[in-house]
């Protein structure tokens, strides 16, 4: 087996591009080698800011040889009456690169046809690899591409070299004016190169020892983490490591070195969140905290090389960070001198969305809607403070701090509200209003925060749908899918018993005289359908079977917390060995009622007349229903859906016997209607748990 190595060298690539490039280049070479029939072992890929590397240490020297039978024209046109090959046979053989003497006749389901046995493959790997390298370079995708010089070709950043080796041989190709070779380049300062690489296997030692490049991103990340933790410990604290920032600095350096710097303790009067954000966003630096969670006046930054003069570099970083912290301190002090009333007044000039009023209008809607949600959820004790939080929710949008650090919106609102005399509960809710910020983000920890989060998202959804701005395809500029999913998660994780229809109607009503482009009754219907789609996506993403999710949604989904509990119980029911047979029984009943919604022109009510029960099986079913239904209703109202589904095992034998021995659609219309009503009473209760007709077994 041979060792293949391919390196694309380029100018500094944005850190966010690198993980995708690693995955994509592995996939491109895996597909290309498979298509070329070149066997290989594991394909590894690595990326730094200046290079993308593919390594295939176990590559076959040549493509597999395979014999295939190629069919041609029918026998009757391939040979003449004397049995001699015709022009058609000769053309067929020539087209396959073989002599006509190799043609034979093959029996097929369609008759007798000319055929050839053809051997393919066997090409040397070094002959196939140039095309694969070129194809990979052309197909790599980037969030943004650029052109340079007079080239028509676009790439993530300008390309400077290609290293391509199969063992000790150069894989020859040229792209634009760049020719592949055996030269590589190292870290710009510590090991610039070029370095000649004699073999593919030698590349890794050369790039590390001479080029001073740590190729593996996982190793670079480990270096940053371990050095940061060690330096923080020496300073008497613990590094505050943001995973996103750790990934970013890992992608910004080829030879990471962590440096500890210090700043004036006077800046510790500024809130922790502000200091950390300033360090992370402007200086790509980590904060250090003490054992009580308070920040220490030190920071950790990641360099891309070992500095020649450590103290000079440290002073430079400290000087730059100090300037940033001075700005943050100025914003903090300026904001503390402003009043909430002044900010509320300024919000009148901040547009929420064109046609939906100002941010002050939104704050008033949230104040009202938070109170409604607290009342609907049966949480009157939190109603006042939740409403207060709604009114304060957007005040920090006009603060100097949020003007500089937009990512602190909400967080600063909570801090400022508390500093300006608002309750701890309301202030905490303001700080949590934007949670969850994504699928992996936590939901608000407090009840008031949960209510404000729901209200804020519901208000945005109602307004956008009212202006006919629902998401279409992949386009979702206002993150409405995330907003709906956020509401679902908050409701489920807090166990809030909210009626989704009432919630959304309350949000729609909050817009008062605002003119919608869509009729308000249609807005509600579209929103409910939208939530149904989001709930399906959410629960299937949680691992639930699609049919089980659809069955649970088919019963009802306006009580999201109850839906989650019903779905969990239904999934447990579906895992039982006799699930399929039970479903068939109750699905049959559901299908009959679906088709016979009106019996003999009379709407079915579920009311059964005992005097019309004639067959023993229908009498038995009526008796079992009379016994089970009160327990069913009590358990359902208590939310014990697992116990509700267990009752189906008590019902099923009588239902099976009913279908085996009773003619539902009999000639006697009164009796038919009574039997349909008996099934209706059963299906109505089953339908509160799941739409059994939607289950396919």
From Swiss-Prot:
Keywords: Aminoacyl-tRNA synthetase, ATP-binding, Cytoplasm, Ligase, Nucleotide-binding, Protein biosynthesis. It comes from the Bacteria. It comes from Solidesulfovibrio magneticus (strain ATCC 700980 / DSM 13731 / RS-1). It is found in: Cytoplasm. It catalyses: tRNA(Gly) + glycine + ATP = glycyl-tRNA(Gly) + AMP + diphosphate. Tetramer of two alpha and two beta subunits. One of its GO terms (cellular component) is cytosol. Pfam families: DALR_1, tRNA_synt_2f. PROSITE patterns: AA_TRNA_LIGASE_II_GLYAB. It is an enzyme of class 6 (ligase). InterPro entries: DALR_anticod-bd, Gly-tRNA-synth_bsu, Gly-tRNA-synth_heterodimer. PANTHER family: GLYCINE--TRNA LIGASE, CHLOROPLASTIC_MITOCHONDRIAL 2 (PTHR30075:SF2), GLYCYL-TRNA SYNTHETASE (PTHR30075). GO terms for molecular function: arginine-tRNA ligase activity; ATP binding; glycine-tRNA ligase activity. This is Glycine--tRNA ligase beta subunit. Its EC number is 6.1.1.14. GO terms for biological process: arginyl-tRNA aminoacylation; glycyl-tRNA aminoacylation. Belongs to the class-II aminoacyl-tRNA synthetase family. Its main location: cytoplasm.
């Amino acid at each position: 087996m041979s060792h293949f190595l391919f390196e694309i060298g380029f100018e500094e690539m944005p850190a966010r591009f690198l993980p995708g490039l690693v995955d994509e280049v592995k996939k491109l070479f895996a597909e290309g080698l498979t298509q070329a029939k070149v066997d290989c072992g594991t394909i590894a890929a690595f990326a730094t800011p200046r290079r993308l590397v593919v390594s295939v240490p176990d590559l076959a020297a040549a493509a597999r040889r395979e014999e295939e039978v190629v069919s041609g024209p029918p026998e009757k046109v391939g040979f003449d009456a004397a049995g001699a090959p015709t022009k058609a046979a000769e053309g067929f053989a020539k087209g396959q690169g073989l002599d006509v003497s190799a043609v034979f006749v093959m029996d097929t389901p369609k008759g007798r046809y000319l055929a050839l046995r053809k051997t393919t493959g066997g090409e040397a790997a070094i002959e196939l690899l140039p095309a694969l390298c070129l194809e990979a370079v052309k197909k790599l995708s980037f969030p943004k591409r650029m052109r340079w010089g007079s080239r028509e070709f676009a790439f993530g950043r300008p390309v400077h070299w290609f290293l391509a080796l199969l063992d000790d041989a150069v894989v020859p190709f040229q792209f634009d004016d760049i020719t592949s070779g055996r030269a590589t380049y190292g870290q710009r300062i510590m090991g610039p190169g070029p370095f000649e690489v004699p073999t593919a296997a030698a590349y890794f030692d050369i790039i590390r020892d001479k080029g001073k490049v740590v190729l593996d991103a996982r190793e670079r990340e480990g270096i940053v983490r371990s050095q940061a933790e060690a330096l923080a410990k020496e300073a008497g604290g613990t590094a505050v490591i943001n995973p996103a920032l750790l990934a970013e600095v890992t992608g910004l350096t080829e030879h990471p070195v962590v440096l500890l710097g210090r700043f004036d303790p006077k800046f510790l009067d500024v809130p922790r969140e502000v200091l950390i954000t300033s360090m992370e966003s402007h200086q790509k630096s980590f904060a250090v905290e003490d054992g009580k969670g308070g920040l220490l006046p030190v920071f950790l930054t990641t360099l891309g090389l070992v500095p020649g003069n450590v103290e000079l570099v440290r002073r430079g970083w400290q000087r730059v960070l100090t300037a940033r912290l001075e700005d943050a301190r100025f914003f903090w002090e300026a904001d503390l001198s402003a009043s909430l009333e002044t900010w509320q007044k300024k919000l009148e000039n901040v547009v929420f969305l064109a046609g939906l009023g100002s941010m002050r209008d939104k704050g008033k809607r949230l104040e009202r809607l938070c109170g409604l949600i607290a009342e609907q959820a049966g949480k009157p004790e939190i109603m006042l403070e939740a409403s207060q939080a709604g009114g304060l929710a957007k005040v920090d949008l006009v603060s100097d701090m949020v003007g500089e650090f937009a990512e602190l919106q909400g967080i600063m609102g909570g801090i400022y509200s508390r500093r300006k005399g608002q309750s701890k509960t309301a202030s905490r809710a303001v700080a949590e209003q934007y949670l969850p910020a994504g699928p992996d983000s936590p939901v608000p920890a407090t009840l008031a925060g949960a209510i404000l989060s729901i209200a804020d998202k519901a208000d945005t959804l109602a307004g956008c749908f009212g202006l006919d701005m629902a998401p279409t395809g992949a386009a979702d500029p206002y993150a409405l899918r995330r907003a709906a999913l956020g509401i679902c998660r908050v409701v489920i994780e807090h166990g809030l018993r909210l009626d989704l229809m009432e919630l959304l109607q309350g949000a729609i009503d909050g817009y008062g005289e605002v003119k919608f482009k869509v009729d308000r009754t249609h807005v509600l219907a579209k929103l409910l359908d939208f939530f149904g789609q989001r709930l399906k996506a959410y629960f299937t993403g949680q691992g639930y079977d699609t049919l089980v999710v659809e069955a649970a949604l088919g019963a009802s989904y306006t009580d999201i917390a109850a839906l989650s509990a019903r779905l969990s119980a239904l999934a447990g029911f579906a895992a039982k060995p006799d699930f399929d047979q039970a479903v068939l029984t109750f699905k049959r009943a559901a299908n009959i009622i679906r088709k016979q919604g009106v019996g003999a022109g009379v709407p079915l009510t579920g009311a059964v007349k005992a005097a019309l029960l004639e067959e023993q099986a229908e009498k038995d079913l009526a008796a079992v229903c009379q016994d089970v239904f009160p327990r069913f209703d009590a358990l359902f109202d208590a939310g014990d859906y697992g116990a509700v589904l267990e009752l189906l095992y008590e019902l099923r034998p009588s239902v099976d016997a009913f279908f085996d021995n009773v003619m539902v659609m009999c000639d006697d219309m009164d009796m038919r209607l009574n039997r349909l009503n008996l099934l209706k009473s059963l299906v109505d209760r089953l339908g509160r748990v799941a739409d059994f007709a939607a289950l396919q077994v």
